[in-house]
Amino acid sequence: MRRVALPWLAALTLFLHAAAAPAPAADRASPPEAQRQASVSRPRLALVIDDLGQNLHRDLRVLQFPGPVALAILPDAPHARALAEKANSAGKTVMLHMPMAPAGGPYAWRPGLPHDALQHRLDEALRAVPHASGLNNHMGSEMTVRQLPMLALMTELQRRHLFFLDSRTNRGTVAAASAQQVGLASLSRDIFLDDDPSPAAVATQFREALALARKQGSVVIIGHPHRSTLALLERELPRLEEAGIDWVDMGQMIATRANRAMAAHGRDGVYR
């Protein structure tokens, strides 16, 4: 798993350095550069689908999405390994959807567990989801508010060259702030598509996500494999280009945000 993740982060580092370097004067006025600048100025969207690995037939619909969707796979799901292998072969981003309290199960991080036990559970979860280049929390409202375990997690992810996405299941989360503190490549979720999985509510959330992307320049969306969510995404994702939205992968979104908090999550780029 480390061998898979390391080239990804190395490429991201090169991307950040390249983006920071000034273009030669002769290139600044060239049509390709003008096109690149226009593309960079377009709003960007990153999409993660959580809770995968439980129903392979259903989850394969996510693999058919026409773009860089990230698949967040539960380590204790019966099809976790098979789906991770298929997603990696399809060129999609594989993520570990790491259970955290109040979630239960053999991999869950829970308050009161010693550091060695937390480390062991992370090791086993990553073995269950091969090719993971990052992780986000599954549930976790009881864990992501605890600074010491979150700092320990982010330090370990930094050592493994993995990124972190804070699902923000608790408004008091310190997970993203801990990632920022140790300099870990990380993001924070902006929109849950389907807290209410009714078709009308999912459609409303998707419109809100596009509006937020246009307002702040980027949006990170998390959805789940509900019928209503999959149906909406199958219909709407092919329309993003026409809508002026660039659908980007997690690495591009991390580079876009450069570990800075959005206004809803912090101040002057620093997480609250």
Language-model-derived ranges and their functions:
Residues 2-4, 8, 12-15, 19-272:
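Catalytic-site microenvironment of enzymes
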